[in-house]
Amino acid sequence: EFTARAVRDCWDVGLQLGHAVHSLGGTIALARSEIEFATAAVEARWLWGDRGLAEEFRQSFARRVVAGRMSRFYRDCLEARRVEWARHGLSASALVPDVKRSPGGLRDVQLVRWLGFCRHGTTDIDELVHRGPLLPGERDVLVDGHRLLTGVRVDMHLEAGRAQDVLTRDEQLRLA
């Protein structure tokens, strides 16, 4: 009931939420079969409710979806991005980019986080620097790029009054 009410309230103010309710086992099974769901689950965090259940999910997900099939998870993440790049153009210098999905967009920052989780058990960029796969300068590029792209994306959403990820020529001129 809480979830239904919260989703309804979000819709009433114009927010679009993806949502579903699954058992722990069903969530793990879905994450093992759909990489898009699995990568969303990498970013899952406790907001409200049973903190113990959230921690049980996190541990089960890490063990059964990622660590238990590390090479496959890694390969599937990369393949999903390749498919998205092909769909949205292969150039990071597109004239009308999708700030979320085009090469060099927000998904590429997320990809670093997903692969970091896969190999090092964390999505935290600073922790990935500490553990070694990222250099401090790479961290700065990722953090600054994420901040810029997120700001642009949020601004476009607010201006459009809906989800808007394509940085059209008009949007480029407005934001310049």
Please describe what each predicted stretch is.
Residues 1-176:
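A nucleotide- and high-energy phosphate-metabolite-utilizing enzyme signature
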